[in-house]
Amino acid sequence: MANPLPPRPDLIAAVATAPGRGGVGVVRVSGPDVGPLAVAILGRLPEPRHVTYCRFLDRAGAPLDEGIALYFAAPHSFTGEHVLELQGHGGPVVLDLILQRCLELGARLAEPGEFSRRAFLNGKLDLAQAEAVADLIDAASAEAARSALRSLSGEFSARIDELVEQLVRLRTLVEATLDFPDEEIDFLEQADAFGRLKAIGTSVAAVRSQARQGVLLREGLTVVLVGQPNVGKSSLLNRLAGFDAAIVTEIAGTTRDTVREAIQIEGVPIHVIDTAGLRETSDPIEQLGIARSWEAVEKADVALLLVDAAHGVGAHEAQILAKLPDVVRLTVHNKIDVAGEAPRATADEIWLSAKSGEGVDLLRAKLLQAAGWQAAGEGAFMARTRHLDALDRAARHIEQAGAVARQLELFAEELRLAQAALAEITGEFSADALLGEIFGSFCIGK
């Protein structure tokens, strides 16, 4: 009986497929000492990048399972290290036996996102690409998946690298002027440095606009439905969801708690929250529901105030509007089928029927407009809030550089800060705490 191999801190293993039962399950191992582990569990080291059908063996040499082994020799692997993938039957017990055998042979259980983190540290992916791995897995729509794949292929990073390169060239001109102050040549004027700075600022704004679309695809928009009881909030939720997500009756106050449903409009996730009708009541349960309604409003991106189209906005609705926080507000005149109105929309009002569906497409368009959504197109890429923050800081430093352009030391420093902000996106400059936060949100097998 073979003795267990000593633990190897640099050898990691994890189940790479989703929990539960399936036809195939994958255990992934990565690290410099994959070879001895492969020999112990397979009886041989498979030929790199070839499919090998074999048995997976326990300590006594008895089979745990049989399946396919794939060996990728460094640096030609996802992590840049030696990688072994064991593809067996997808039952949780079988996969656990294979994983435990790997741990017995000296591997340790991988931390969340550790495979992707190693790929980043070994230069196989930059940080934006590594994040796109998780975004592709979590994509809730075809548009989100396509955008994540573009980021994974490096389109977003290429835009950032281009901006960084332009800043580096501009910084070189400034440094040359500082290093040769007595020369008659004005490097900055000859190279149109200030025109180039303006062009960089325009490019940063364009990239930020695209990144904002990616954030919308990833995070979506939270929309809360508010109004008096029995104005059709639950009916509108059901119409948007396409099924009966909330109970609808003629009895006022049927909805006592918030009801949440996720929908998609042109691939953008919209989180719709139905709330209890806002009114004065002595019912303690309804009071609790109304309190939760206001909590939902505080966290929303858009508040839809529903009113009966036959009555319009009255004193009570005006009070609700006055209490709404600083969010996008749209007044929805529901029940136009009863009031005899036609579907239409103005800047901040919509006339529709949740019951018949008339005018609901106008609402969908308004929600996308409120989100700032533009047609994704072929150039859209996935992005995160931290990317927007970095682009905002870069834009501010570029603007400040223009304000201090004649003070060359300050000009150079603002350009450096803009470059550093952009470099955070791809991970060229990133604190360990940031890396831990990003990769810690990944699943274990990635």
UniProtKB/Swiss-Prot annotation:
EC class of the enzyme, as a word: hydrolase
Required cofactor names: K(+)
Residues that hold GTP according to the record: 230-235, 249-255, 274-277
Top-level taxon of origin: Bacteria
Keywords tagged on the record: Cytoplasm, GTP-binding, Hydrolase, Magnesium, Metal-binding, Nucleotide-binding, Potassium, tRNA processing
Binding positions for Mg(2+) per the UniProt entry: 234, 255
Entry GO MF terms: GTP binding; GTPase activity; metal ion binding
Gene3D superfamilies reported for this sequence: P-loop containing nucleotide triphosphate hydrolases, Probable tRNA modification gtpase trme, domain 1, tRNA modification GTPase MnmE domain 2
EC number assigned by the record: 3.6.-.-
Annotated residues for binding of (6S)-5-formyl-5,6,7,8-tetrahydrofolate: 28, 85, 124, 446
Alphabetized HAMAP family for the sequence: GTPase_MnmE (MF_00379)
Family according to the record: Belongs to the TRAFAC class TrmE-Era-EngA-EngB-Septin-like GTPase superfamily. TrmE GTPase family.
Name of the molecule in the record: tRNA modification GTPase MnmE
Gene: mnmE
